[in-house]
C-alpha cells in the first residue's frame, strides 16, 4: 500500500529510537575514523621501516584479523569482555579496578564495540597506507634532508601530502564501513538482544524492516543512510581538495603535537631516507620501535590465542576465575561434537560452494567488463562507467530490503543460488580490473589482431596473463568477503541444511 511520505514522517518526527541508534552510529563512525586511521598510519610506517625485525611475521600478525570471520572474532571478544570470567577484567583486577560490565553498561557498551571494530579494521587500513608508502618518490626525502628538514617536517610536508589520495580513499571507506556496522553489534549482543544504548542504525533497520516485516519503513531508513553517507563523502572530498594555508599549518594541532610526532617520526623514518638530525640514537630508536610493535602485535594476537585455546577447554575451564590460559587436559571432544551434533561439514561445504562460485564468476565477468571499458570504444561508455562507479558508493544495507524482495520474487529464498547471484561482478571489481588492463600496451592487442587472433583469444592469451596480479588480488578479496559473509545469509536462509559456516556458528552458540 502506498503511504506517500508517511514512513519518513514517522521516522523523523515520531521515532525517538531511530535517533538514538543514529547517535550510536555516528559514535561508531567518528570513533573508527579518529582511532583506526591514525593507528593504521603509524602501524604502516613501522612495518615500512628497515629497523623493524621479523617484519614478515608482524605483517602476518596485523593482517590476520582481515581474514578472520566477524562471527568468530565477535564471539571471542565477547568472552574476553565477560564481566564474570573475562580476561580483560582479570587484568584490571591487578590494578585494583573492580570488574566492569563492558557489554551491559551504557557507558562502556559502545566502547566495547569499538574494540572489536579497531581490532578488525586497523590491519586492513594499514595495508592501504603501506601500499601508498611504496609509491612515494624517495628523492623527495633526500631533497628535504639537504634543505635541513627535520623528521617531523619530512613527515608533515612530504609523507602526508603524498599519501593524500590514499588517505582520502581510506577515510571514505572507513566512514562508509563503520556507518553500516551490523555484524559486530549483532553477534556481540547475541542477535536480537541488542540494547538500545549499543544499537546501530542497520541493526534497527534489520529489526523493523525484516523481522517486523515493515519493508517500506525499513527502506526509508536505507534512503536516509544513503543521504548521510553521500554527505560524509562529499565533505571529505571537499576537505582534501582544499589547500592548506600557512596559518592552518601553524594550528594548535602542530604547536601541541609537534614534539610527539617528531619523536614518533624519528622512530619510524621513511624506508629509504637517512635523516641527519636525530634526537634519538639509532640504537635506542630501533629498540623502541621493535618493543612497541611487539607489544601491539601481542595485543593483536590475544583474541587468536584465546580462540584457539578455548577450542580445547571444557565449559568449566572457560568460565573459571581466575581464567585458565591453557587446559592441562585438552578436550578434543569439542571438535568432534561440532561435526556430530551439528552439520558442520555441510556448512563448510556450502561455504566452499558459495565462495568459489562467487569468486570464479566475479573474476570472469569483472575481467571481461574491465577489458571492455579499458580497450573498447562504444556509445555511452563514459556514462555507463560513471553509473557503475556510482553504484559502488551504495552500501549493501541500503539495497538490502529491495534485494530481499527481488530474490523472493525470483524464487531464490533459502537457497545457495540466492547467496551467489547478488554478489557476482561488483562495480568495485570491474573498476579494479579496468585499472589493471588499462596498463596493457595497446600495441600488443593490435599486433594480435593483425595476426588474425579473435577477440576472446586476445583476451584469454594476452590480456589475462598480463593482469594476473590484479586477478589474484580480486580473487583473494572476493573469496574472503564471500566466505565471511553473514548479514545476507542471515536474512534469506531458514533451513540449517543451507547454512554457511558463519551462520552455522551462531547456531552453535545459540545466538
PLM region spans:
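A structural signal for multi-pass alpha-helical bundles of membrane permease subunits
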Residues: 1-249, 281, 285-511
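Membrane-interfacial, low-structure loops and terminal tails that flank and connect transmembrane helices
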Residues: 249-280
Amino acid at each position: 500500500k502506498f503511504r506517500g511520505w508517511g514512513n519518513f514522517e514517522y521516522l523523523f518526527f515520531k521515532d525517538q529510537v531511530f535517533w538514538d541508534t543514529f547517535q550510536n552510529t555516528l559514535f561508531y563512525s567518528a570513533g573508527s575514523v579518529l582511532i583506526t586511521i591514525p593507528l593504521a598510519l603509524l602501524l604502516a610506517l613501522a612495518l615500512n621501516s628497515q629497523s623493524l625485525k621479523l617484519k614478515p611475521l608482524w605483517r602476518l600478525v596485523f593482517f590476520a584479523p582481515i581474514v578472520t570471520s566477524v562471527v568468530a572474532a565477535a564471539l571471542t571478544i565477547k568472552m574476553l569482555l565477560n564481566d564474570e570470567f573475562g580476561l580483560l577484567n582479570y587484568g584490571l583486577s591487578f590494578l585494583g579496578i573492580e570488574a566492569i560490565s563492558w557489554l551491559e553498561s551504557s557507558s562502556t557498551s559502545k566502547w566495547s564495540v569499538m574494540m572489536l571494530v579497531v581490532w578488525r579494521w586497523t590491519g586492513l587500513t594499514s595495508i592501504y597506507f603501506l601500499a601508498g608508502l611504496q609509491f612515494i618518490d624517495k628523492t623527495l626525502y633526500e631533497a628535504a634532508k639537504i634543505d635541513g628538514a627535520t623528521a617531523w617536517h619530512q613527515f608533515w610536508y612530504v609523507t602526508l601530502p603524498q599519501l593524500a589520495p590514499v588517505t582520502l580513499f581510506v577515510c571514505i571507506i572507513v566512514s562508509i564501513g563503520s556507518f553500516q556496522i551490523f555484524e559486530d553489534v549483532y553477534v556481540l549482543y547475541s542477535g536480537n538482544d541488542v540494547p538500545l544504548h549499543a544499537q546501530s542504525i542497520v541493526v534497527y533497520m534489520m529489526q523493523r524492516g525484516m523481522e517486523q516485516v515493515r519493508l517500506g519503513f525499513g527502506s526509508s531508513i536505507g534512503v536516509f543512510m544513503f543521504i548521510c553517507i553521500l554527505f560524509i563523502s562529499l565533505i571529505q572530498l571537499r576537505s582534501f581538495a582544499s589547500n592548506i594555508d600557512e596559518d592552518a599549518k601553524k594550528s594548535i594541532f602542530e604547536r601541541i603535537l609537534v614534539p610527539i610526532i617528531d619523536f614518533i617520526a624519528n622512530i619510524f623514518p621513511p624506508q629509504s631516507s637517512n635523516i641527519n638530525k636525530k634526537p634519538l640514537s639509532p640504537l635506542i630508536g630501533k629498540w623502541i620501535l621493535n618493543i612497541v610493535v611487539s607489544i601491539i602485535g601481542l595485543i593483536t594476537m590475544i583474541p587468536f590465542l584465546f580462540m584457539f585455546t578455548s577450542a580445547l577447554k571444557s565449559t568449566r575451564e572457560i568460565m573459571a576465575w581466575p581464567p585458565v590460559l591453557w587446559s592441562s587436559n585438552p578436550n578434543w571432544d569439542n571438535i568432534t561434537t561440532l561435526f556430530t551434533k551439528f552439520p558442520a561439514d555441510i556448512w563448510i561445504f556450502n561455504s566452499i560452494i558459495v565462495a568459489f562460485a562467487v569468486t570464479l564468476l566475479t573474476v570472469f565477468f569483472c575481467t571481461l567488463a574491465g577489458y571492455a571499458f579499458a580497450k573498447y570504444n562504444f556509445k555511452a561508455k563514459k556514462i555507463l562507467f560513471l553509473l557503475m562507479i556510482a553504484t559502488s558508493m551504495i552500501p549493501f544495507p541500503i539495497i538490502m530490503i529491495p534485494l530481499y524482495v527481488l530474490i523472493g520474487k525470483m524464487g531464490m529464498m533459502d537457497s545457495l543460488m540466492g547467496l551467489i547471484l547478488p554478489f557476482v561482478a561488483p562495480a568495485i571489481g570491474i573498476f579494479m580490473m579496468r585499472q589493471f588492463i588499462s596498463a596493457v600496451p595497446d600495441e600488443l592487442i593490435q599486433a594480435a589482431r593483425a595476426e588474425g587472433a579473435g577477440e576472446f583469444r586476445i583476451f584469454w592469451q594476452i590480456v589475462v596473463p598480463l593482469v594476473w596480479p590484479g586477478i589474484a588480488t580480486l580473487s583473494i578479496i572476493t573469496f574472503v568477503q564471500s566466505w565471511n559473509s553473514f548479514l545476507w545469509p542471515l536474512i534469506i536462509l531458514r533451513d540449517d541444511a543451507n547454512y554457511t559456516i558463519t551462520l552455522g556458528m551462531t547456531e552453535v552458540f545459540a545466538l
